[in-house]
Design a protein with these regions (language model features):
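A helix-coil-helix interface module used to build multimeric assemblies
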Residues: 1-177
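Conserved small/polar residues in nucleotide/adenosyl-binding loops
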Residues: 178-184
Length: 184
């Protein structure tokens, strides 16, 4: 839907009616039709494009227009990774919170500290827990960095040359959007 909407805004022969039809049927997935088609063409993405076209007959000709299946699959993987990193981040924040409470609770409880795997001197359980917490905070910073800088792979057509899009746009200058970050 996003591709069709963008292509419409850029002046390709994509109508609002077609975009509306795609939008209205975005969750209307005929898995049986896609599975049957995949038996014939042995191509997962194009089988789903075909099945989507069955429920969106007015838009069938513009679904996936100029795109390559890797564009769909690879960018989907990036979105899945982003969502997974968000889950990890939420859980990590909870662990840090619990560990900070643990450190505060045991801040006065003495224990033996080690250096080079050898007993060294007294410290507290709370102090040791703050060191563990510090390591997790560095992991959290790394997750934040990765989420803030995660990028989609762009859409440069079948072989990365933009030839399919250049043809659609009649040789008009191609624009690279690979610098755009994925919304978090």
């Amino acid at each position: 839907v996003a591709l069709a909407r963008a292509e419409m805004k850029l002046g390709l022969n994509v109508t609002q009616e077609q975009v509306d039809e795609l939008e209205a049927n975005i969750d209307n997935i005929d898995y049986a039709a896609a599975a049957e088609r995949e038996k014939l063409v042995r191509h997962d993405v194009m089988s789903h494009v075909y099945a989507y076209g069955l429920v969106c007959p007015k838009a069938a000709g513009i679904i996936h227009l100029g795109a390559t299946s890797c564009y769909v699959g690879d960018n989907t993987d990036v979105i899945i990774m982003r969502d997974a990193l968000k889950v990890v981040k939420r859980k990590l924040v909870k662990v840090i919170d619990q560990l900070a409470k643990f450190a505060d609770k045991y801040k006065a409880m003495p224990c033996l500290a080690y250096t080079h795997l050898q007993p060294a001197q007294l410290t507290t359980v709370g102090k040791r827990a703050t060191l563990w917490c510090n390591e997790l905070l560095m992991d959290l910073e790394d997750l934040d960095f990765r989420l803030a800088n995660l990028k989609l792979l762009g859409s440069k057509g079948t072989t990365g040359t933009q030839a399919s899009f250049m043809e659609l746009f009649h040789g008009d200058t191609a624009v690279s959007y690979t610098h755009l970050t994925l919304p978090t």
